[in-house]
Design a protein with these regions (language model features):
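A short, exposed loop/beta-hairpin motif centered on an aromatic-Gly-Thr core
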Residues: 14-24
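Short aromatic-glycine-(Arg/Gly/Cys) micro-motifs in beta-strand/loop hairpins
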Residues: 1-15
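Hydrophobic aliphatic residue packing
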Residues: 6, 19-20, 50-53
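Short, composition-biased linear "edge" segments at structural boundaries
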Residues: 31-32
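Short, mixed-charge low-complexity intrinsically disordered segments
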Residues: 35-58
Length: 58
């Protein structure tokens, strides 16, 4: 499993993100859509390293 970060814009204009665990980018997008986010605009960041970011943040 890989960790994917999806940065997206909600229909009301607010920006948000979702972290998804999946084997492939295509599966991550399907999980995102199945969560009720189909049709929302967004960007997919592959293999996001959460541990590296949390260590840098604090």
């Amino acid at each position: 499993m890989k960790t994917f970060l999806i940065d997206y814009r909600r229909p009301d204009g607010r920006e948000d993100f979702k972290v998804v665990e999946a084997d492939t980018a295509a599966q991550a997008v399907e999980i995102f859509r199945a969560a009720g986010c189909d049709g929302w605009s967004g960007f997919l960041f592959q293999e996001f390293d959460i541990m590296a970011v949390s260590e840098r943040v604090g």
